[in-house]
Amino acid sequence: METRYNLKSPAVKRLMKEAAELKDPTDHYHAQPLEDNLFEWHFTVRGPPDSDFDGGVYHGRIVLPPEYPMKPPSIILLTANGRFEVGKKICLSISGHHPETWQPSWSIRTALLAIIGFMPTKGEGAIGSLDYTPEERRALAKKSQDFCCEGCGSAMKDVLLPLKSGSDSSQADQEAKELARQISFKAEVNSSGKTISESDLNHSFSLTDLQDDIPTTFQGATASTSYGLQNSSAASFHQPTQPVAKNTSMSPRQRRAQQQSQRRLSTSPDVIQGHQPRDNHTDHGGSAVLIVILTLALAALIFRRIYLANEYIFDFEL
């Protein structure tokens, strides 16, 4: 088999290493690749004790992608069990249905333990899940021991080692339960995180919302400004209200244009000046001085006009 594959491929190296590690069967699981296909494995797992699957021995396929271990495998059960559909890719956090929860550090052994740990759990409508009654599952568990795989030739009666009652067996059961719990918890966390990120990504706002917020802040910062200053500032903030399109439906060019328009709005001199409070007394003082100067100039012009008129009359009489 080694001569048929590129030994420099990370997937080939990883699968050959795992095949060597799983070569010897245990009392709970066993898995090996087919003789003519390194990327398809057949596995056998024992049903978890103290459950509806106690006493059952279940067989299935693991189809691995060329990108393994960066992408998860697909898992297909071949033995009727009452928990997973036969001949269909099942939906687990470690399977190809959930690449977002898969970790490259997980292995085929991880998948086998997860299958054992997930068997007593509820399907909850997942793809490939079944919810048979406990009686039906126990009957299928007994029937599973007579199954023989045509693809690899494995017989369920002798493919696994006899079940032990020692600490190794209980440790494997506990490890499977703990692994299933951790994977399930990780899937829930990732699912909630994905919901949050999608809601943030799909959230859109319009410039109207921005206009509603800016005057409030501006009025709080310039409570002592005159009414005319507030009106001019409010007028400088007024912009046409056009809703901003969602990021997911805009082209890169449209997103860049949107970002540039937002930057121009935020760096506008009117906006910058609007956030800088002015001294009301300084404005009134300057206006008063200007009024006085204009009044004095007007009075000087009037007096000069009167003076010139009187001087002309005096010269005329002489």
Curated annotation (Swiss-Prot):
Family annotation (CDD domains): UBCc_UBE2J
Membrane-topology annotation of the record: Single-pass type IV membrane protein
Reactions the enzyme catalyzes: S-ubiquitinyl-[E1 ubiquitin-activating enzyme]-L-cysteine + [E2 ubiquitin-conjugating enzyme]-L-cysteine = [E1 ubiquitin-activating enzyme]-L-cysteine + S-ubiquitinyl-[E2 ubiquitin-conjugating enzyme]-L-cysteine
Pathway: Protein modification; protein ubiquitination
Compositionally biased region (Polar residues): 229-248
GO annotation (BP), single: protein N-linked glycosylation via asparagine
Protein name per the record: Ubiquitin-conjugating enzyme E2 J1
